[in-house]
Amino acid sequence: MYNKIKWALIAMILSSVVNAAERDFTPSAPVPSRVLGWVEKAMILPGHLVMNAKMDTGALTSSLDAKGLTPFQRDGKDWVRFDVETQDDNDKVTSQSFEREIVREVTLRGAGGKDDRPVVLMKICIGDQIYEEQFTLRDRGEMKYPLLIGRRTIAHVGLIDVTRQYVLPLKCTE
């Protein structure tokens, strides 16, 4: 008898806590209204370099395929020089050089060992919006997608529909 009363009291307490939690719940951030596919066209600015971008919810920071990474100093700060290449539907390759200040460095650890990468700010267009976001730089030549969009950027862009691709047409004019 005592055991039944104890479990009934526990059930009532838990029920009131859950109801109170549901009643008092407010989202911590507004829900983005746009929906995008798990792969979208993106444009690196300046230069209007268009490439396929994979929405990578497993990565916190976005990553860009960068060739010829060359660190250097400017005004006592760490900078990096690199090239970004794109290939259009006719297999024409376009390349553009960039110089960016290194805002931080990250060390990634995986099955292949330790990988140190510079992080820079880059402007990117997805759909009709331009975002200035942090990107790790790495030669991703062996990877299918030259551009990975991480969770920090996805939070600004919208929700991902994993059953769709190329939902948002590029409409940036900068």
Regions found by a protein language model. Give the residues of each.
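Bacterial N-terminal signal peptides
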Residues: K6-S16
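N-terminal secretory signal peptides that target proteins for export/translocation
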Residues: M1-N3
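Pepsin/retropepsin-fold aspartyl endopeptidases
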Residues: A20-E174
